[in-house]
């Protein structure tokens, strides 16, 4: 799977480590991917963080069918990026998809690694 990456022109300032907290700070970027019956999951991309447009007729607004999995990545002392248990995250999100009757995602461990390398 190819992931198109569009980097934010002016990245935000990183918070101090003693100020971190869940839901308090957000990354400068977000991962998006489209789904259609004919193409399955496609058009994977990382874009600058921002509003997500959707139709008022979107099922998620009417029936609440959605899944979430919070993959974590940490900066290593050597400057590299370490993903925290990506295979387990993929298994959990696919299990959630199955429970919600949402098509499962393709195994995404390789694309996560590719994105972290960039």
Predicted regions and their residues:
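Conserved alpha/beta cores of soluble small-molecule-handling proteins
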Residues: 1-118
């Amino acid at each position: 799977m190819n992931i198109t990456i569009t980097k934010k022109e002016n990245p935000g300032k990183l918070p101090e480590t003693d100020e971190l907290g869940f839901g308090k700070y957000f990354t400068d970027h977000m991962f998006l991917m489209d789904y259609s019956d004919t193409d399955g999951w496609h058009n994977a991309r990382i874009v600058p963080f921002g509003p997500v447009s959707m139709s008022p007729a979107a099922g998620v607004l009417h029936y609440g069918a959605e899944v979430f999995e919070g993959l974590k990545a940490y900066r290593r002392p050597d400057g590299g990026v370490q993903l925290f248990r990506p295979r387990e995250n993929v298994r959990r999100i696919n299990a959630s998809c199955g429970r919600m009757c949402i098509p499962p995602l393709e195994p995404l461990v390789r694309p996560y690694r590719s994105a972290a390398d960039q």
